[in-house]
């Protein structure tokens, strides 16, 4: 009887808690050292403030053009926005620092193929057609939502027509509403309609106690990224709060996804939650997070928020990161990482196995 009882108990446990039925595993990646191909003659990039992909797996990177004087003696500063085909060949480019937002930061491609960019040294976001034509701008270049109207002024977090060093944006494919991570100077998500009219906002500066407690709808410091899931939820990087906060479109808080650091100390000066992207399957079973604090890409089970695997380490070799800053995922599940500071490159990580 005893063996039969044990077998029945095991069967009951397996029925109630089937560990393998819904277990999520992480895919494996390898660096694609052949991507991108050589840039046009004499081109050189500065810090790459963002990377984004199109439905056709073309890749855009945004270039801050901040090369050194020595580099200017031998090279040409590449344009601000560079477009690659899936094989890594340059197929288009436009922009310079006089037209794009200052310290260009983040990019997003909407359903019509338009390219959106922000800038963490400016007060605007911009929308470009694929041929480089400027279609829309929200905010005024050099006019900040701060106490004195300058970049260094304390953020007011209130303006309906101004921003303060926005970090990124996402466009709702259903109605064209624009959600802005605002940003380095403010502590909010600002929402505009498809024509740029202000609709609503949420978020404010968090106290240290609120940051340590994971309080909803407040931000430790930089509101560093924003993304929308297929379910219509808004994912926001609370970078120094070491978490991704998830909201409904009206700002109602849904949950925290912690990205812990080794010390557990909060707020975290460097922060861990730098950028997010989703796996390309309809359910978006995986969430990818760029952790600039450890120079790693984390692969998370989307439903539970559990970190399944990570890749990357500090360094300059292929597959390493030097200020890994933003990431994007294409339709095949390949991951692209753009680096700022002295990294100044984009790397492709090819999916080679897994779910």
Task: Name each region found by the language model.
Residues 6-20:
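Bacterial N-terminal signal peptides
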Residues 22-355:
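Eukaryotic scaffold repeat domains enriched in small/polar residues
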Residues 1-4:
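Positively charged n-region of N-terminal signal peptides that target proteins for export
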């Amino acid at each position: 009887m005893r063996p039969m009882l044990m077998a029945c108990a095991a069967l009951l446990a397996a029925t109630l808690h089937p560990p393998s039925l819904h277990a999520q595993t992480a895919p494996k990646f390898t660096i694609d050292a052949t991507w991108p191909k050589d840039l046009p003659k004499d081109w050189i990039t500065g810090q790459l403030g963002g990377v984004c992909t199109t439905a056709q797996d073309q890749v855009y990177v945004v270039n801050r053009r901040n090369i050194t004087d020595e580099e200017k003696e031998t090279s040409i500063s590449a344009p601000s926005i560079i477009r690659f085909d899936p094989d890594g060949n340059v197929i288009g480019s436009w922009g310079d620092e006089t037209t794009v937002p200052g310290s260009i930061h983040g990019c997003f491609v909407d359903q019509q193929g338009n390219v959106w960019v922000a800038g963490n040294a400016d007060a605007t976001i911009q929308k470009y057609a694929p041929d480089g034509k400027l279609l829309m701008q929200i905010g005024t270049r050099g006019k900040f939502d701060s106490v004195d109207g300058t970049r260094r002024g304390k953020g007011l977090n209130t303006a309906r027509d101004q921003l303060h060093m926005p970090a990124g944006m996402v466009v709702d494919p259903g109605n064209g509403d624009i959600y802005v991570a605002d940003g380095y100077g403010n502590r909010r998500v600002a929402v505009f309609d498809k024509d740029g009219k202000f609709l609503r906002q949420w978020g404010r500066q968090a106290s240290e106690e609120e940051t340590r407690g994971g309080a909803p709808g407040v931000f430790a410091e930089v509101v560093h990224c924003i993304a929308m899931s297929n379910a219509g939820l808004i994912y926001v990087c609370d970078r120094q709060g070491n978490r991704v906060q998830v909201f409904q479109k009206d700002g109602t808080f849904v949950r925290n996804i912690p990205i812990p650091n080794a010390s557990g100390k909060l707020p975290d000066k460097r922060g861990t939650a730098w950028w997010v992207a989703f796996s390309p399957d309809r359910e978006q079973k995986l969430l990818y997070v760029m952790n600039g604090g450890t120079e790693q890409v984390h692969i998370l089970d989307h439903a539970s928020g559990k970190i399944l695997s990570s890749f990357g380490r500090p360094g300059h070799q292929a597959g390493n990161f030097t200020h890994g800053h933003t990431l994007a995922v294409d339709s095949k599940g390949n991951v692209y990482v753009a680096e700022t500071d002295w990294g100044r490159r984009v790397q492709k990580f090819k999916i080679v196995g897994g779910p």
